[in-house]
Amino acid sequence: MTISDSPQTPENLSLPKQGFRQLIKIVADLRLAIVLLLAIALFSISGTVIEQGETISFYQQNYPEDPALFGFLTWKVILILGLNHVYTTWWFLSLLVLFGTSLTTCTFTRQFPALKAARKWNFYQKARQFEKLALSTELAINDLKFVNNLLEQKGYKTFQENQAIYARKGIIGKIGPIVVHAAMLIILGGAIWGALTGFLAQAMVPTGSEFKVNNIIEAGPLSQPQIPKDWGIRVNRFWIDYTPDGTIDQFYSDLSVINNDGEELKHKTIYVNEPLRYHGVTFYQTDWGIAGVQAQVNNSPIFQLPMALLNTNGNGRIWGTWIPTKPDLSEGVSLLAKDLQGTMMVYDQKGDLYSAVRPGMILDINGVRLKIYQLIGSTGLQIKADPGIPFVYTGFGLLMMGVIMSYVSHSQIWVLQEDEHCYIGGKTNRSQVTFERELLGIIESLEPEKT
């Protein structure tokens, strides 16, 4: 007989089962769940601190190798570990799945059995059983019906078997932890679903322009159905409100959702913290810029030139353009603007400041009449779709409800009638003082029955 032909003993057959039980025990361990939760929180914080979805040059500039931030955090480390898109990395999603598995295992191996035990009728049949209760007494009464009615008046659900009564209330407190676990699983599922199916895009759009979502910064592997293809956005107008001292108070974008035929489907003026939502896609007002300037040289048609954001080495934002003053482009002037309030600076061919102008003013320079009509603003939009958000909100609501439910005390009272003696005792899992007062009140209500 070969080894493979040897009969399997019961001990050998039970080894896989024992290993599975040991694995379940490890996965359901509260300590593992706490470690996973702390890891998720830590990496979530890193995703908040470290800018997400930026270009490689951005990380090279802000996280150089020398000196490294905290001695180790460089742009290479960020890119290798995926810290530039934490929430969609395989290891972060794996942490969420593992934490969800731990919660599920704990729910079925601990919470459901605890609820089942709490729902079970557990009668005391011997007087000595009351000795293990911290709160118990003996009364000389023989009217169990009166005791039963009194407990029901106090909100207890009572069960009677022969000369024994079992009463309980607050079973919802045992359901609370299960609701909490279910809520956390819904939140985790929503986060994973959002990472797989959501996308993040950006757009800088001049006033009067139309666009479709195409500048995708981040996208999940299942996000294509979320990206709008049969509708787009038209920027009707963009403007900025300034305070009396010249600082920005708020900037606004008047947007229209349009279909492929140009028909308006929805209209809304958005500003910071007041986005436009349409078919699961949200448009946030996040930035602004100067897209161009309209000008006229002598009697030429009004033309529009683009304005570019200049490098000021961190000394504020300035946009500039070059306006030709001769048909052969041999001469021209530079026009600079720092905001949409209207004041622009004109520099001649040598780079010297020539004049300051405002929209509608006419300037004589290089032998021509230059008229500036207006600056064209552009709105900076962040576009986001996250189908997991409804699940996260639902889970958060259930989580709050489950936490409140968990604070309800699960109280139990046992009564046993033996001859002329009535034994009564009880216990609770929280609010011990309140329960003691309630039980003493019940006992005091029963004491007059001694006579």
Curated annotation (Swiss-Prot):
Membrane topology qualifier: Multi-pass membrane protein
Disulfide bonds: none
A Gene Ontology biological process term: cytochrome complex assembly
Locations listed in the record: Cellular thylakoid membrane
GO cellular component, one term: plasma membrane-derived thylakoid membrane
Coiled coil: none
Domain of life: Bacteria
Transmembrane portions of the chain: 30-50, 89-109, 175-195
Pfam family, one: ResB
Keywords linked to the UniProt accession: Cytochrome c-type biogenesis, Membrane, Thylakoid, Transmembrane, Transmembrane helix
Chief localisation class: membrane
Protein family (similarity comment): Belongs to the Ccs1/CcsB family.
Protein purpose: Required during biogenesis of c-type cytochromes (cytochrome c6 and cytochrome f) at the step of heme attachment.
Subunit structure: May interact with CcsA.
Name of the featured protein: Cytochrome c biogenesis protein CcsB
Organism: Crocosphaera subtropica (strain ATCC 51142 / BH68)
The encoding gene: ccsB
